[in-house]
């Protein structure tokens, strides 16, 4: 007879760990299955952790989790080939106030979180691939793994196995991910002495800086670049839609190398030692690409469900929140003695709709399509903004009114009046 659990969680990333932790802590018999050698083994890169989402699951997590730096400064750069126009926000952590965001090293963070999951009572088995879901009368009743005698039964299965979610796709629970809905991000870890990092970014102690980059660095493809400060390293990377990489014939590695040579980026990395490289798929199709998230005996959360806010570059908080809402739905049904059927699990979808997750994704639901069909936001406008800034700031004896007329003429020449008005309307609608 196959072994039976109350719940099986497929995946040991942020969403899977949250779900497994809460279910096990509530007394359920939980099995967590992970493909990697250990949780986090496939994620060597740095990332952003949103403390509020984690603290709703593990109070006082800031004192326990292996955080790198608290982010006190956010920089956003709109770039052409040689310059950028940007905006900065820098705050301070007042006495008694807790930081909201931290940089982390996923390999370290995931291992810590996995230990908390096991301490809560869940059984973790690594280096195990779920090859398919077991079904009976159209209901999911467990999983089959690649191990000998790998059939395992459960009352409920939580799918948190990443962006491709091969298990859900193979079992017909969701369609295959489309190339226009997923981005490929490549990242490097550049190691520097702590003192040099703090000097270059004007920070001290455990304070950190995040830089997000848009514009010509993606060579007309929909995507962004980024740079995060860790304690003794800098995470730097760039990501674009898979469909764009295929169409343009550009190597992600070359795109990253070109970005690192940009005059604004190169000095920040000078003298560093590259020790780690990784590539990662990110679901960026937004609200319109989210599949069915529940069914007979199963729910899906995290990247598996496409829960990423690409406009605000948020992922880990959505992953943890969806994992929490999935677990809370399961526990509520269990307490009420109700079955994990599709009708009852609809509560999970309702909880998602009531949360910031779906509200934010719905707000920006048109943004992926707008960027896909309006590449001028990534090419023409960065050039125009840079040229306008240079014209205004240059002191050359030309009066400011003439400079303003020259700038307006440049904008109209590149986009036309109708084009400028149309682009403005598109952006307003996308952010409404």
Task: Please describe what each predicted stretch is.
Residues 3-32:
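N-terminal Rossmann-like FAD-binding beta1-loop-alpha1 element of flavoenzymes
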Residues 10, 159, 300:
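Redox-cofactor binding/interface segments in oxidoreductases and associated redox assembly factors
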Residues 15, 38, 164:
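Conserved Rossmann-like nucleotide-cofactor binding loop
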Residues 26, 36-82:
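N-terminal FAD cofactor-binding segment of flavoenzymes
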Residues 95-115, 245-251:
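Short beta-strand to alpha-helix junction loop
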Residues 116-265:
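Predominantly flavin-linked oxidoreductase catalytic cores and closely associated redox partners
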Residues 218-222, 231, 244-325, 335, ...:
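FAD/FMN-dependent oxidoreductases across multiple families
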Residues 331-432:
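C-terminal helical "tail/cap" subdomain of flavin- and related membrane-associated enzymes
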């Amino acid at each position: 007879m196959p072994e039976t659990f109350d719940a099986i969680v497929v995946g040991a990333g942020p969403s899977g760990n949250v779900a497994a932790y809460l279910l096990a802590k509530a007394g359920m018999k939980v099995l967590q299955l992970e493909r990697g050698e250990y949780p986090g083994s496939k994620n060597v890169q740095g990332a952003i952790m949103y403390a509020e989402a984690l603290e709703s699951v593990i109070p006082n997590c800031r004192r326990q989790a292996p955080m790198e730096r608290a982010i006190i400064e956010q920089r956003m750069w709109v770039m052409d080939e040689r310059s950028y126009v940007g905006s900065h926000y820098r705050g301070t952590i007042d006495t008694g106030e807790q930081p909201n965001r931290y940089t982390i090293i996923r390999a370290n963070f995931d291992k810590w979180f996995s230990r908390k999951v096991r301490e809560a009572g869940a059984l973790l088995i690594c280096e195990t691939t779920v090859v398919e879901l077991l079904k009976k009368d159209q209901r999911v009743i467990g999983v089959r793994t690649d191990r000998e005698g790998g059939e395992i039964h459960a009352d409920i299965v939580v799918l948190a196995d990443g962006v491709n979610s091969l298990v859900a796709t193979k079992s017909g629970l969701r369609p295959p991910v489309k190339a226009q809905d997923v981005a490929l991000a490549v990242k490097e870890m550049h190691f520097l002495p702590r003192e040099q990092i703090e000097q270059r970014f004007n920070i001290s102690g455990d304070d950190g800086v995040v830089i997000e980059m848009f514009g010509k660095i993606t060579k007309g493809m929909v995507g962004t670049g980024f740079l995060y400060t860790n304690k003794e390293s800098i995470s730097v990377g760039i990501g674009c839609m898979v469909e764009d990489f295929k169409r343009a014939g550009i190597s992600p590695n070359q795109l990253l190398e070109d970005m690192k040579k940009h005059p604004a980026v190169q000095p920040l990395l000078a003298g560093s030692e590259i020790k780690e490289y990784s590539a990662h798929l990110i679901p960026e199709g937004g609200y319109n690409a989210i599949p069915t998230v529940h069914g007979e005996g199963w729910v899906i959360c995290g990247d598996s469900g496409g829960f990423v806010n690409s406009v605000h570059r948020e992922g880990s908080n959505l992953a943890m929140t969806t994992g929490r809402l999935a677990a809370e739905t399961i526990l509520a049904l269990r307490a009420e003695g109700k079955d994990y059927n599709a009708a009852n699990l609809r509560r999970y979808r309702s909880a998602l709709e009531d949360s910031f997750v779906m509200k934010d994704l719905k707000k920006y639901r048109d943004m992926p399509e707008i960027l896909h069909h309006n590449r001028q936001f990534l090419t023409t406008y960065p050039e125009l903004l840079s040229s306008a800034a240079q014209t205004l700031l240059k002191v050359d004896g030309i009066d400011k009114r003439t400079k303003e007329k020259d700038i307006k003429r440049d904008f109209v020449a590149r986009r036309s009046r109708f084009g400028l008005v149309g682009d403005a309307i598109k952006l307003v609608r996308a952010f409404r």
